[in-house]
């Protein structure tokens, strides 16, 4: 046998390689319809090919002339291997940096059954509460946790990060202030990233930030509010009572940014007079993740309930009178109040809030207190030992963090010793370092720290000696101080029942089974892009090389992350046609805000700070005007024509009228009505001719990738919802990521950061930080990296084409039953379509909600209801749904239309019918005498597929008005559920 002879002929080898590549290709796994399905769907639409469909859908003037320049697509396994090599370049050090970020232990039962479970992470925001009771209960637990720990009356269902929560608290304080002040006091003991985000948020609103010492602030100057850190960033615990009393006497509200774990030992903010409490629940089992995602919290007094940002879960009742949960007080949210909204927050951090709540459920009040006491005792030990070694500890009272004055010791020597042992400390200055103890710290870690801080000629000591020192310093223990907590917390049974893994596992499964996620069926929400979140994309999120990195770790330890960011930024720049990308905004709402701030800073830098008018089409999503107002801009509405397109004549008139003051136009493309507007380039040119900039909302980017690019169309800024187009899961309402792309002239103004240099070119003119962490929720960026790496240019482009195909297929199949409200000039839609149900109210007294709830009986989540047009539903199938699933969904809507027809002709009672009584629970079918004029079978099994697998709504239709009139946002007593 000749060893170097080819085993296969070259052509045979090529064929085998091609077959192997086809088998391992990710794109066909991601895209639902196969080639045969695509041809059948095209036949229904009357097109010979996908390209022919796209040619008639997307204006030729904006089409890409050449394919995207991206790396060749890799298989799932090859991409994971490539990312693993990048991850290996990160160095996982033991970080004692603190500053709001701490290592923690994620209970494995929570990691496996929530974080890694698509039943939890693929769900959408619970706007259809009857099929989201599990998530809503977990979030109610979260709110109860926060209410109990902070000692305040109400809490929301999470915010993006602690710094953003503090900024939202400032906005609330400003909104309710009656003393006409425009100054806000910020303690210099707050975390630096919080101070910077507050300064960023304050500037466009004309708020003057006063950073100072709360102990010496004399209140001669009027302030509308203040924020204090508890414990302080350097670990000190202050008695804030006197300051708060003085602030209240001057009509100011006081916010306390508090570590929730410390509140198991410390007097809660609500008990010493705080009006608002904010903070991060990261140390409740959420990995560091180089900055996120983590769930922040926001608690306040009930009198401010209609001003609270984000979402609040409230208790109501269903049609059978049983307790049921829903999102409460929705009329205060940005999608309804628009420019009058007090916040633009939309997506928050639901998945992480669920994890944090279950961490508290699993450990219970005693377990949480034990964790906190262990941390505190180790910190006391550390302080005693360092004092024994001759160091000064700055604080008399502390929880987990020490500021260590080095005295004559060299900082450089200390840091060299730390480097040798893979340890990070916080560096205050040349004379002091910070050490924060956390849940993972052990006695062995303390020995290592003592060895680092011991002088070469000093003698180390045993733990008995440290114990003696601690015994002599018992007064420093929080339990023996005036700061000790005396009130009970987490007394509800949910926090005292599920402490074994068996019990928690079953509880998690019970909640998960109440929720409809992508594991059940398609979620056809328009403008939400509920596409596949592939397992290969999700796996790297849990790798320690990404999860155990502190956001303020030295750059030398984060080379893997830097490569990831550079590659992802380059890919997104190519996809969008922009010169620069910022990955910092940690939600779409924050991307909008950051993009508009960049435009504002650009005008200001050119001496045109007077430009403050933002033109926004009347069809825009509510976050657009809310974001514009937050940036200090005046919103001027631009009319839309009868086809839902921007009225170009009205745009020209408004641009002309406000030419001197014009700052920007906010435009969504394709439009919020699901159409590629033909004159988009003319629209951009009009704005530019009057000195304005064009901000493109990237919510509908799933219809652009590989076909056209915002930068080529004429946009100057565009935010990208990575949790839509680029496969980060919605998590039931977060996490999300909203990076922005900008044209070259705007690159210098991209967000900066006070702790970490993120772009040298922007440090002098940047807008400041818009999120607490330098790269936002950095650890989930691996998901989008994996998606692009596995799809490649061809796969991404094909996905866009199929998304457009799927939407048009649905529109075509349903147009005979429900009018398609808006279409392009060739009778086609983009990636979503609006079905008009308004006539049904007159013909059959059927409301939009009746159809939405009836879809649950068919096993589907409703499309987006009554937006962007009241009385309509907007359907976005995405490219991931198969033809079979699309057909099932269409069949469900057709069957519902036939049910409505029976009402219209008088065959069925107009009030007692399958729609008005939907959704039907299993309990409603078997309890008591059946008194409806239709059968149980019609109610529960209206379609063949429901017999194969039936998803049961957990509750009947919920009484929304009752819940708002009787506002309760914490756990009900257990007897309420049995009554």
Swiss-Prot record:
GO terms for molecular function: glycine binding; glycine dehydrogenase (decarboxylating) activity; pyridoxal phosphate binding. GO terms for biological process: glycine decarboxylation via glycine cleavage system. It catalyses: N(6)-[(R)-lipoyl]-L-lysyl-[glycine-cleavage complex H protein] + glycine + H(+) = N(6)-[(R)-S(8)-aminomethyldihydrolipoyl]-L-lysyl-[glycine-cleavage complex H protein] + CO2. The glycine cleavage system catalyzes the degradation of glycine. The P protein binds the alpha-amino group of glycine through its pyridoxal phosphate cofactor; CO(2) is released and the remaining methylamine moiety is then transferred to the lipoamide cofactor of the H protein. Belongs to the GcvP family. The glycine cleavage system is composed of four proteins: P, T, L and H. This is Glycine dehydrogenase (decarboxylating).
């Amino acid at each position: 046998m000749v060893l170097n002879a080819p085993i296969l002929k070259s052509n045979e080898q090529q064929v085998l390689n091609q077959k192997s590549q086809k088998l391992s290709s990710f794109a066909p796994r991601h895209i639902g319809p196969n080639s045969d399905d695509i041809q059948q769907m095209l036949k229904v639409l009357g097109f010979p090919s996908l390209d022919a469909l796209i040619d008639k859908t997307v204006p030729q003037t904006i089409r890409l002339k050449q394919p995207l320049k991206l790396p060749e697509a890799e298989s799932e396994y090859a991409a994971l291997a490539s990312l693993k090599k990048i991850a290996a370049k990160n160095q996982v050090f033991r970080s004692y940096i603190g500053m709001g970020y701490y290592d923690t232990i994620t209970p494995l039962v929570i990691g496996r059954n929530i974080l890694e479970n698509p039943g939890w992470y693929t769900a959408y925001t619970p706007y259809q509460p009857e099929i989201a009771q599990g998530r809503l209960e977990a979030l109610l637990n979260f709110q109860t946790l926060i209410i109990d720990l902070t000692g305040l009356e109400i809490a929301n269902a999470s915010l993006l990060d602690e710094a953003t929560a503090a900024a939202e608290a400032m906005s609330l304080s400003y909104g309710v202030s009656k003393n006409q002040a425009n100054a806000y006091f910020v303690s210099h003991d707050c975390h630096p990233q919080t101070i910077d985000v507050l300064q960023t948020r304050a500037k466009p609103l004309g708020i003057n930030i006063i950073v100072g010492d709360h102990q010496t602030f004399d209140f001669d100057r009027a302030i509308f509010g203040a924020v204090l850190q508890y414990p302080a960033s350097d670990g000190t615990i202050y008695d804030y009572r006197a300051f708060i009393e003085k602030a209240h006497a001057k009509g100011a509200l006081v916010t306390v940014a508090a570590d929730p774990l410390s509140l198991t030992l410390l007097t809660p903010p609500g008990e010493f007079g705080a009006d608002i409490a904010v903070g991060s629940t990261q140390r409740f089992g959420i990995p560091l993740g180089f900055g996120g995602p983590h769930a922040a919290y926001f608690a306040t007094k009930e009198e401010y309930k209609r001003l609270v940002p984000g979402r609040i879960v409230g208790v109501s009742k269903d049609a059978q009178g049983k307790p049921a949960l829903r999102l409460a007080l929705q009329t205060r949210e940005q999608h309804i109040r628009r420019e009058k909204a007090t916040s633009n927050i939309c997506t928050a951090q639901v998945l992480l809030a669920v994890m944090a709540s279950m961490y508290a459920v699993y450990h219970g009040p005693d377990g949480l207190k034990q964790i906190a006491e262990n941390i505190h005792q180790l910190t006391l030990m550390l302080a005693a030992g360092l004092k024994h070694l001759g160091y000064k500890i700055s604080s008399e009272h502390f929880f987990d963090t020490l500021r260590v004055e080095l005295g004559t010791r060299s900082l450089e020597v200390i840091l060299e010793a730390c480097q040798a042992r893979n340890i990070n400390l916080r560096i205050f200055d040349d004379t002091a370092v910070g050490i924060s103890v956390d849940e993972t710290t052990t006695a062995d870690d303390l020995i290592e720290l003592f060895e680092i801080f011991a002088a070469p000629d000093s003698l180390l000591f045993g733990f008995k000696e440290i114990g003696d020192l601690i015994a002599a310093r018992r007064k420093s223990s929080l339990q023996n101080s005036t700061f000790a907590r005396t009130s009970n917390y987490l007394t509800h049974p949910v926090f005292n029942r599920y402490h074994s893994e068996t019990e928690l596992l079953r509880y998690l499964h019970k909640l998960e089974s109440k929720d409809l996620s992508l594991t059940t069926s398609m979620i056809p929400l328009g403008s939400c892009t509920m596409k596949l979140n592939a397992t290969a994309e999700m796996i790297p999120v849990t790798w320690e090389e990404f999860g155990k990195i502190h956001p303020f770790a030295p750059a030398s330890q984060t080379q893997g992350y830097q490569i990831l960011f550079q590659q992802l930024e380059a890919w997104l720049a190519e996809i969008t046609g922009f010169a620069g990308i910022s990955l910092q905004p940690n939600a779409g709402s924050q991307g909008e805000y950051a993009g508009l701030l960049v435009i504002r800073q650009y005008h200001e830098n050119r001496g045109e700070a007077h430009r403050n008018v933002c033109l926004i089409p009347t069809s825009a999503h509510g976050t657009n005007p809310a974001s514009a107002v937050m940036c200090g801009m005046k919103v001027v509405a631009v009319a839309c024509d009868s086809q839902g397109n921007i009225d170009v004549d009205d745009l020209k008139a408004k641009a002309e009228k406000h030419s001197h003051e014009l700052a920007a136009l906010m435009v969504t493309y394709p439009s919020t009505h699901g159409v590629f507007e033909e004159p988009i380039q003319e629209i951009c040119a009009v704005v530019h001719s009057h000195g304005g900039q064009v901000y493109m909302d990237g919510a509908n980017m799933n219809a652009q990738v590989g076909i056209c690019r915002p930068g080529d169309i004429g946009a100057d800024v565009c935010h990208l919802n990575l949790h839509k187009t680029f496969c980060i899961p919605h998590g039931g309402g977060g996490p999300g990521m909203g990076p922005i792309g900008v044209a070259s002239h705007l690159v210098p103004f991209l967000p900066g950061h006070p702790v970490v240099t993120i772009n040298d070119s922007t440090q002098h003119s940047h807008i400041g930080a818009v999120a607490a962490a330098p790269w936002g929720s950095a650890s989930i960026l691996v998901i989008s990296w994996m998606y692009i790496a596995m799809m490649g240019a061809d796969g991404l482009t094909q996905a866009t084409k199929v998304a457009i195909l799927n939407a048009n297929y649905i529109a075509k199949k349903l147009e005979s039953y429900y009018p398609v409200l808006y279409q392009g000039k060739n009778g086609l839609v983009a990636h979503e379509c609006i079905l008009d149900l308004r006539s049904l109210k007159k013909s059959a007294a059927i409301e939009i909600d009746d159809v939405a709830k009836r879809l649950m009986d068919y096993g589907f989540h409703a499309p987006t209801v009554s937006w962007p047009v009241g009385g309509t539903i907007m359907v976005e199938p995405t490219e991931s749904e198969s033809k079979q699933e699309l057909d099932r969904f269409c069949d469900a809507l057709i069957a519902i239309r036939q049910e409505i027809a029976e009402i219209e002709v008088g065959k069925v009672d107009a009030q007692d019918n399958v729609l008005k009584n939907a959704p039907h629970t299993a309990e409603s079918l078997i309890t008591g005498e059946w008194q409806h004029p239709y059968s149980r079978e019609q109610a529960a099994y209206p379609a063949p597929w429901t017999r194969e697998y039936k998803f049961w709504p957990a509750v009947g239709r919920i009484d929304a008005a009752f819940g708002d009139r009787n506002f309760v946002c914490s756990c009900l007593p257990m007897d309420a559920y049995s009554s």
